[in-house]
């Protein structure tokens, strides 16, 4: 079943942390793994960050979270940036350049799927499809996401939901295709 996440859904942090670690982002060189997970917990429990429980949808079966996604509208971006740069970063003593991801991954007016993650033991069971289907049912007229150019499998999934490549962006250390659905 799909539902909005709560602050108590700490399993999301395991998947989010694993995903971010796989991207080898610069912030991982700045803080210990323990501090990194403290940061993730802090921002997940917040109401303002892009990785807040408020922007998270989970897919759950028999009380276990099998996957999740984070999505939000462009109009929330200033609040998210403000929270990171003026709150989270100072709380953890991070440098002025410290970020998890840059904030230029989306374009004005978009409802953006930031992260879709399915736990390894639940892959190939339709969990990603259910999460993506829920996202595409949004009433927003412009939906977007980014997919690594090397991730052919994910691209195929997104194309099956009628996402089309709009442009290219550079995130972390890799090139991504910015894909959209215009309703």
Question: In which residue ranges do the predicted regions lie?
Answer:
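Conserved GNAT acetyl-CoA-binding A-motif
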Residues: 109-111, 132, 138-149
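Active-site rim helix/loop that mediates acceptor-substrate recognition in acyltransferases
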Residues: 34-56, 61
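A short beta-loop-alpha structural element at the N-terminal edge
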Residues: 1-16, 26-30
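Conserved beta-strand in the GNAT
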Residues: 58, 64-73, 112, 117
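Conserved acetyl-CoA pyrophosphate-binding loop and the N-cap/start of the following alpha-helix
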Residues: 122, 126-134
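C-terminal "cap" of GNAT-fold acetyltransferases
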Residues: 141-155, 161, 167-183
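Conserved GNAT-fold acetyl-CoA-binding loop/helix
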Residues: 22-44, 89-93
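Conserved acyl-donor/pantetheine-binding loop and adjacent beta-alpha core of acyl/acetyltransferases
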Residues: 73-111, 115
């Amino acid at each position: 079943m799909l539902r909005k996440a709560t602050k108590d859904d700490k399993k999301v942090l395991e998947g989010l942390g694993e995903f971010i670690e796989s991207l080898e982002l610069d912030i991982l060189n700045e803080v210990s793994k323990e501090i990194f997970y403290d940061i993730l917990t802090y921002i997940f429990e917040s109401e303002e960050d892009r990785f807040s429980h408020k922007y998270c949808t989970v897919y759950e079966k028999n009380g276990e979270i099998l996957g999740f996604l984070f999505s939000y509208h462009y109009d929330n971006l200033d609040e998210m940036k403000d929270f990171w740069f003026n709150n989270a970063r100072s709380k953890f003593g991070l440098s002025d350049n410290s970020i998890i991801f840059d904030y230029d991954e989306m374009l004005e007016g978009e409802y953006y799927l930031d992260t879709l993650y399915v736990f390894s033991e639940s892959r190939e069971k339709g969990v990603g499809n259910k999460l993506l289907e829920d996202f595409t049912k949004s009433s927003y007229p412009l939906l977007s996401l980014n997919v690594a150019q090397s991730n052919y499998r994910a691209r195929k999934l997104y194309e099956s939901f009628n996402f089309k490549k709009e442009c290219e962006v550079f995130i972390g250390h890799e090139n991504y295709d910015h894909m959209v659905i215009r309703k």
